[in-house]
From Swiss-Prot:
Residues of the active site: H117
Top-level class of the enzyme under EC nomenclature: transferase
Protein name listed in UniProt: Nucleoside diphosphate kinase
Function of the molecule: Major role in the synthesis of nucleoside triphosphates other than ATP. The ATP gamma phosphate is transferred to the NDP beta phosphate via a ping-pong mechanism, using a phosphorylated active-site intermediate.
One function term, GO molecular function aspect: metal ion binding
Compartment(s): Cytoplasm
Biological source species: Saccharolobus solfataricus (strain ATCC 35092 / DSM 1617 / JCM 11322 / P2)
Gene from which this protein is expressed: ndk
Amino acid sequence: MVAQRTFVMIKPDGVKRGLIGEIISRFEKRGLKIVSLKMVKMSRDTAEKLYEEHKGKSFFEELVNYVTSGPVVCMVIEGDDVVQVIRRMIGNTDPKEAPPGTIRGDYALSKSENVIHASDSIEKAQREMSLFFDKSDL
């Protein structure tokens, strides 16, 4: 199997609550490789690009305001079938639907403060990585 790369972002509530190390540890224990990592304060423009598929939805403004409210940790993670592996590890967007043992099941406070974002396809991962990382970072 060929290793793939995906984009993962620890959201402001995860950073503020000191969950960065715990989340990274889960990925590393699963045998995934952190290729690049940075903490940033996301601009509104970047947030709107990151979540462009939600533009026009009722929660879009709240989401953009939330992810720009504090620092986030952006990562490029590599591994076999990494997109699906990480999607399973993070759990459902709604923490009530996320089983215990998943990142959101264990740490998310609400649908909006759900600790983490991860790309849901290779195509989206490539687009999302390019918002935060130059080719030289990878």
